[in-house]
UniProtKB/Swiss-Prot annotation:
Native organism taxonomy: Bacteria, Pseudomonadati, Pseudomonadota, Gammaproteobacteria, Thiotrichales
GO annotations of cellular component type: cytosol
Complex and partners: Homodimer.
Family annotation (CDD domains): GATase1_GMP_Synthase, GMP_synthase_C
Residues spanning the signal sequence: none
PANTHER family assigned to the protein according to its UniProt record, in alphabetical order: GMP SYNTHASE [GLUTAMINE-HYDROLYZING] (PTHR11922:SF2), GMP SYNTHASE-RELATED (PTHR11922)
EC number: 6.3.5.2
Domain GMPS ATP-PPase, first and last residues per copy: 199-391
Function: Catalyzes the synthesis of GMP from XMP.
Catalysed reactions, as listed in the record: XMP + L-glutamine + ATP + H2O = GMP + L-glutamate + AMP + diphosphate + 2 H(+)
Protein name, entry field: GMP synthase [glutamine-hydrolyzing]
């Protein structure tokens, strides 16, 4: 079998918010790549055997920082592409000069390609729309580099080494705003580095199954199945690899979407014939959450109880040696903090390092190398339903953070019904995949309404729908008024505990996507 990691690109991270985007663009071309901090050991870089190296952008200023690329990068003889800060430090380390720009440049710009012969601009038009994001600029390229593209505000918009396969761009080819950014990255990765496109779903499935079989042997494996994308794909790949050696534990918290527990059992236990143990823990969660109003406290209680129940059930499975988890590559990067990424750590992730200390199980993470979009494609390749893989994100605590304040059984049932109507109508009107996330929120306040001739004094449901690329920022979805009116009418008429429906028009920032 072909080694899908054989031809690979090493990405050194200088702290850019776009570093993961670079990796995703490379992988979309069918080439494996990994992200490591810029100051990783020289021996590691040497032994990594990359076909090429990409230096990411970053927030530092080259002329007042000691953050630079390791010299080994330029001694290996492999092609190098510096992006933004990566270009600046590469040029400076070769005798060039970088200074603060008179005017920072953030946004779209037109560059003129001056030389497209056998370089990153091969087979491209001379005028290109790109995305700039920089405060410094290269003012002198030095004796080793030549300018191969320029713009009005950045006379040195791209460079190439005169004798070695080193290239730099002042803009960001990895963003969708750079019109032909994919072509630039492909020219570097495939044409200049000579990488074979081995990284595809068929090869990944074959490779993963082989690795799982070798690692696990005849041992038993336990997986906490939530019905979310990651754990669902882990269940599917493990089932193909080891069959009935896998036991899934599905803890039904009672805080899932309407009928979600039954759907999980239908797909995995009935359709795929996977061994799934369903634990009905609804009452335990409601009891533990009684009287609790603080969002963070609710999250902690839900998280701890979930782990406790999982541990109880896992202990009943004899001779289990492995605990499988749905850790994906972005989790690994995000949670590694300063040991892995120079960007600020936003949060710790529940999937990484989550092995209970008292459990003497080895950790199995089949998706650890994959980004979310790759996980979804893998799931399709394994036969999982499209609607399961491309559902909107759902928080770990479930409806526990979509019911404001205290959680009661009545509130959960009311929200489940209202949320299901909203989702159903989004699908019916072909709007579901036009928005990034959509859901209902239960507000524990009552409002007067009139249904027929009867006065009704019941609860309020807020509808939330947003459009986002990365969920770091989001805009509220401008859904048609007729559609919102239809959803509102259905909820008020069909859910007796609701007398009023409102629509949230807050972006992120200043708001967050979830209400709690």
């Amino acid at each position: 079998m072909t080694d899908i990691h054989n031809h690979k690109i090493l990405i050194l991270d200088f702290g850019s918010q776009y570093t993961q985007l670079i990796a995703r663009r490379v992988r979309e071309l069918g080439v494996f790549c990994e992200i490591f901090p810029h100051d990783v050991a020289a021996d590691f870089i040497k032994n990594y055997q990359a076909k090429g190296i990409i230096l990411s952008g970053g927030p530092e200023s080259v002329y007042d920082s000691d953050v630079k690329a390791p010299e080994i990068v330029f001694e290996l003889g492999v092609p190098v592409l510096g992006i933004c800060y990566g270009m600046q430090t590469m040029v400076m380390q070769h005798g060039g000069e970088v200074k603060g720009a008179d005017q920072s440049e953030f946004g779209k710009a037109i560059i003129n390609i001056l030389n497209s012969t056998n370089n990153i601009f091969s087979n491209m038009e001379h005028e290109q729309l790109v995305w700039m994001s920089h405060s410094d600029k290269v003012t002198q390229t030095g004796e080793h580099f030549e300018i191969i593209a320029s713009s009005t505000n950045a006379p040195v918009a791209a460079v190439a080494h005169k004798n070695k396969p080193f290239f730099g761009v002042q803009f960001h080819p990895e963003t969708t705003h750079t019109e032909n950014g994919k072509q630039i990255i492909e020219n570097f990765v495939v044409n200049i580095c000579g990488c074979d496109t081995l990284w595809n779903i068929e090869n990944i499935i074959e490779n993963d199954i082989k690795e799982i079989k070798q690692k696990v042997g005849t041992d038993k494996v336990i997986l906490g199945l939530s019905g979310g994308v990651d754990s669902s794909v882990v269940a599917a790949i493990l089932h193909q690899a080891i069959g009935d050696q896998l036991t899934c534990i599905f803890v039904d918290t009672g805080l899932l979407r309407l009928n979600e527990g039954d759907q999980v059992m239908q797909v995995f236990a009935e359709h795929m014939d996977i061994n799934v143990i369903r634990i009905n823990a609804k009452n335990r969660f409601l009891d533990a959450l009684r009287g609790i109003c603080d969002p963070e406290q609710k999250r902690k209680i839900i998280g701890k109880l979930f782990v406790d129940i999982f541990d109880e059930e896992a202990a009943k499975i004899e001779n289990a040696k492995w605990l499988a988890q749905g850790t994906i590559y972005s989790d690994v990067i995000e949670s590694a903090g300063n040991n892995q990424s120079k960007a600020h750590v936003i949060k710790s992730h529940h999937n990484v390092g989550g092995l209970p200390k008292e459990m003497k199980l080895k950790l199995l993470e089949p998706l650890r190398e994959l980004f979310k979009d790759e996980v979804r494609k893998l799931g399709l390749g394994l036969g999982l339903p499209y609607n399961m893989l491309y559902r909107h994100p759902f928080p770990g605590p479930g409806l526990g953070v979509r019911i404001l304040g205290e959680i009661k059984k009545e509130y959960v049932e009311t929200l489940q019904k209202a949320d299901a109507i909203f989702t159903e109508e989004l699908y019916k009107h072909n709007l579901y995949h036009d928005v990034s996330q959509a859901f209902g929120v239960f507000l524990p306040v009552k409002s007067v309404g009139v249904v027929g001739d009867q006065r009704r004094y019941e609860y309020v449901i807020a509808l939330r729908a947003v459009v986002s690329i990365d969920f770091m920022t989001a805009t509220w979805a401008n859904l048609p008024y007729d559609f919102l009116s239809l959803v509102s009418n259905r909820i008020v008429n069909e859910v007796k505990q609701v007398s009023r429906v409102v629509y949230d028009v807050t972006g992120k920032p200043p708001g967050t996507i979830e209400w709690e």
